[in-house]
Design a protein with these regions (language model features):
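Generic low-polarity alpha-helical segments
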Residues: 1, 31-37, 56, 494, ...
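Bacterial N-terminal signal peptides that target proteins for export
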Residues: 1-7
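Residue-level marker of intrinsically disordered, low-complexity segments enriched
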Residues: 7-8, 91
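Bacterial Sec-dependent signal peptides at the C-terminal "C-region" and cleavage site
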Residues: 14-27
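Contiguous beta-strand segments within globular domains
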Residues: 26-56, 226
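Non-catalytic cap/lid and distal C-terminal segments of serine-dependent acyl enzymes
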Residues: 60-103, 108-576
Length: 576
């Protein structure tokens, strides 16, 4: 036994003494991605920072009908990402299944990808460095006129799509090269900026963009906000002034407010809107949508927040006054109402609640969570984990999205892991990221303090307390009802489908319970529920037909509301 033991020890020492080059090579799959000189020059030409800080992606797809980068999503194709620093032309970055810094979706590791034939593409999301007024320095993807979609953003570099055969465990290395840069839809004028895009004016739609002094001071560099302005029929031939319907929501790009089209009819609930807007029967109003994409998302949520800065003030103190100076707009609260769906629904309600004297009415359809006891389907105050419900023997994933018949389309974990793969430190440009950025405090590293661990879903209740104190709309109303009730009388109009795709009806029920049962004094509010209606339901037709309300019908409702609340001395030639 002693002889055998001695031989084993000697053998072990001999193995340890072998040169490093004789160690077994990794069996993990790897992609090497090189940044070409042409791509770097293209990034610089659009005014973005170099050497490049950002996030590098490799995306794979089984088909080549569209580029792989255009097939990502919660039910989309696999991709992996890694943060990069100071990347220069000619340099190469490796994404390996053996590297814990590389994280992907729906497979966390590249090595989890099944064997097969694929089409692969690389994309480099280019970040901008901000030295903010709060003392933090952060690197983020600056909006480049596309909202905040890193897969389509001008200035980001992409490779050609390459067909490959992937064999897990083979240790094979696949080379890719970033050779071109995504270009903006509309050219940047001399001395201009990619931010918020640069769409050209049309007959009735005018595009405005201004430098915001408030936001520029906060972010430490020039920041812009804009608006798409839909003018009424006859605007150019009259000297009349008009009330404004501010349509809230996601980044509109070059789209006209209300879905208006110069060419003809819109679709869905916008059908007939364009013809109605031009008709003799339409109320003569101006409609406006904001272009307020930012480093976190395609809209700012129209409020001041610790992570995004003073977007609420930038809108009401800079952008709206500028619009009122450039167009014949009635600068009065009664002539200034807001409406929107989903994100825009939360924005419209929050703007009215947090600034009740500034806005004259709000229509919030299928709004984002107005009470964080139901942050979609997560109670951030009492639940321990956002991704699962648990009992002694069972662990069940929380649903994130459903069909109107109840079938589950995705889970909270899946969408959060999708965002984590898209961007570390809340830089995904996605829905859950912007909620953390708007509702939450600044973390020690300058990025938003997470409401829960992005990998495990464990909730941070101290951060949840901050959410409640600052952005829980129902909590805010209950805490300030005595002073606010009279200012909101007749101004809140909310609609939600009782099968909302993202469970957003749950928070509406809680707000409804307070406004229509508990609140004293009671005020006039309107809350509708649509039976078996999904996201984003906007309410029933005022005709009583049981059909869904059209956009043209809503324009009439908003006009009636403003005319009814206008002072007796107001000029109402616009109303019909």
């Amino acid at each position: 036994m002693r002889t055998r033991t001695l031989l084993l020890v000697i053998a072990g020492l001999l193995l340890l003494s072998q040169p490093a080059c004789q160690q077994p090579e990794s069996s993990s799959i790897s992609f090497t991605v090189r940044l070409s000189e042409e791509a770097l020059q293209g990034i610089e030409a659009l005014g973005l920072d170099t050497p490049v800080r950002g996030r590098l992606f490799v995306i794979v797809s089984r088909d080549n009908e569209r580029e792989p980068r255009l097939q990502t999503g919660v039910s989309g194709v696999p991709f992996w990402g890694i943060d990069v620093e100071d990347l220069r032309a000619g340099e190469t970055v490796t994404l390996s299944g053996a590297d814990a810094e590389v994280f992907g979706y729906p497979f966390a590791s590249i090595d989890e990808l099944p064997e097969g034939e694929y089409h692969v593409q690389a994309l480099l999301s280019v970040y901008t460095t901000f030295e903010r007024a709060d003392g933090h320095t952060v690197s983020m993807h600056l909006n480049a006129g596309e909202g905040q979609d890193q897969w389509r953003a001008p200035g980001n570099a992409i490779s050609d799509v390459v067909p490959i055969h992937i064999s897990p465990g083979s240790g094979k290395v696949y080379p890719l090269a970033l050779q071109s840069v995504i270009q903006p839809d509309h050219p940047v004028p001399p001395g201009g900026s990619l931010q918020q895009g640069n769409p050209p004016d049309t007959d009735k739609v005018k595009y405005v963009k201004i430098r915001s002094a408030l936001l520029s001071e906060f972010w430490g560099r020039d920041m812009y906000i804009g608006a798409n302005v839909l003018l009424p029929e006859g605007y150019e031939t009259s000297n009349q002034s008009y009330p404004v319907l501010y349509m809230q929501g996601h980044f509109p790009g070059s789209g006209a407010p209300l879905g208006y089209s110069e060419e003809g009819e819109g679709r869905g609930r916008n059908a007939g809107l364009s013809e109605f807007w031009r008709s003799a029967d339409s109320p003569r109003m101006i409609a406006v949508s904001f272009r307020d994409a930012n480093p976190y998302y395609d809209t700012s949520y129209s409020v001041n927040s610790a992570n995004l800065g003073p977007y609420g003030d930038a809108i009401t103190q800079e952008l709206v006054p500028y619009l009122e100076s450039q167009f014949r707009i009635i600068p009065a609260s009664w002539a200034r109402v807001a409406a929107g769906g989903s994100t825009g629904g939360w924005e419209a309600v929050a703007m009215q609640v947090f600034q009740p004297d500034y806005w004259g009415g709000a229509w919030g359809w299928c709004p984002d969570p107005l009470d964080f006891n139901y942050h979609q389907i997560v109670n951030v105050y009492e639940d321990e984990n956002a991704y699962y419900t648990e009992s002694e023997w069972h662990k069940v994933e929380r649903p994130n999205a459903r069909s109107f018949d109840g079938n589950i389309r995705s889970t909270v974990r899946q969408e959060n892991h999708l965002e984590l793969a898209t961007g570390s430190r809340t830089r995904s440009g996605g829905q859950w990221a912007i909620w953390e950025a708007v509702f939450g405090p600044v973390g020690k590293d300058g990025y938003p303090q997470a409401i829960w661990d992005p990998l495990t879903g464990k909730i941070d209740h101290a951060t949840a307390d901050y959410w409640r104190a600052n952005f829980d709309v129902n909590h805010y109303l209950q805490s300030n009802w005595e002073t606010m009730s009279s200012k909101l009388d007749g101004k809140l109009h909310i609609a939600a489908g009782d099968m909302d795709s993202y469970y957003l009806d749950n928070a509406v029920y809680l707000l409804d319970e307070f406004l229509n049962k508990e609140a004293q004094p009671r005020i006039d509010t309107e809350i509708q529920y649509g039976r078996r209606k999904p996201h984003c339901w906007t309410g029933y037709s005022p005709t009583g037909s049981g059909e869904d309300m059209t956009t043209a019908e809503f324009v009439r409702i908003a006009a009636d509301h403003m005319a009814r609340n206008a002072p007796a001395s107001a000029d109402k030639k616009w109303y019909r």
